[in-house]
Amino acid sequence: MRKGEVLKLGIVPYMEGKEIQLKAFERVKKGETDGILILLQHPPVYTIGVSGGFDENILVPLAELKKKAELYKVERGGKITFHGPGQIVAYPIFNLAKWQKDVHLFVYKLEETIIKLLEEYGIKAGRKPKYTGVWVGDEKICAIGIAVRRWITWHGIAFNVNTDLSYFGLINACGITEFGVTSMQKLGINEDIEKVKEKMVDKFSEVFGIHFNEITLDRLAVIDNAKA
């Protein structure tokens, strides 16, 4: 079984989270571990991926959007999405050379991880043709946007546990106009987010065939003031 590390944090500002990813990326690139899974939440923030769609997917004046949350253009695939408290953001920094050099398979396994997680709560979730992510009916509960460099992945997934979904009303999330978003809470499941994180780690381990040892930020030589 592959050997990896998991880093569990609390609410971390978006750009600090990016720096943590880059530190983890370097550790994986050096071969010190097969992969690092970072789990955290962000303060309210909108991010726009390389697919763009800046103008048509923001439904309010830009100044109004920026009053609600920060806004960043980022390196991941996809268009605009929202991150905020109550949403688990998982950044799997994995060396695909240790699995298969297949990005589509990696995304499929990310989806499978969340589908299996939701099964634990009696929620039937699945995929939707032409779209990435995990869906419950016609509503997306987990968005996926990754980047890959030298076959090492970064960025990742955003899974709605008890997120304030009103923030999604200001955008066409992921550029999708015909379908909505949902959360575990909206589906009637009120679970402590830390317990959901634990189950998520188990499902990552199961689907990707990797054993995780928990680490701290000190292991990545990051000076951080995150609320762990």
From Swiss-Prot:
Its biological purpose: Catalyzes the transfer of endogenously produced octanoic acid from octanoyl-acyl-carrier-protein onto the lipoyl domains of lipoate-dependent enzymes. Lipoyl-ACP can also act as a substrate although octanoyl-ACP is likely to be the physiological substrate.
Residues that bind substrate: 76-83, 143-145, 156-158
GO CC terms of this entry: cytoplasm
Pathway the protein contributes to: Protein modification; protein lipoylation via endogenous pathway; protein N(6)-(lipoyl)lysine from octanoyl-[acyl-carrier-protein]: step 1/2
Lineage per the UniProt record: Bacteria, Bacillati, Bacillota, Clostridia, Thermoanaerobacterales
One family name in Pfam for this protein: LplA-B_cat
UniProt superkingdom: Bacteria
Key words of the record: Acyltransferase, Cytoplasm, Transferase
Record field: catalytic activity: octanoyl-[ACP] + L-lysyl-[protein] = N(6)-octanoyl-L-lysyl-[protein] + holo-[ACP] + H(+)
Enzyme Commission identifier(s): 2.3.1.181
Boundaries of every BPL/LPL catalytic domain copy: 31-212
Database matches in Gene3D superfamilies: Bira Bifunctional Protein, Domain 2
Subcellular location: Cytoplasm
Molecular function per GO: lipoyl(octanoyl) transferase activity
Active site, renumbered: 174
Site (Lowers pKa of active site Cys): 140
Protein's GO biological process: protein modification process
Family recorded in the similarity comment: Belongs to the LipB family.
InterPro entries to which the protein is assigned, alphabetical: aa-tRNA-synth_II/BPL/LPL, BPL_LPL_catalytic, Octanoyltransferase, Octanoyltransferase_CS
PROSITE patterns in the cross-refs: BPL_LPL_CATALYTIC, LIPB
UniProt-recorded name of the protein: Octanoyltransferase
Originating organism: Thermoanaerobacter pseudethanolicus (strain ATCC 33223 / 39E)
More info: In the reaction, the free carboxyl group of octanoic acid is attached via an amide linkage to the epsilon-amino group of a specific lysine residue of lipoyl domains of lipoate-dependent enzymes.
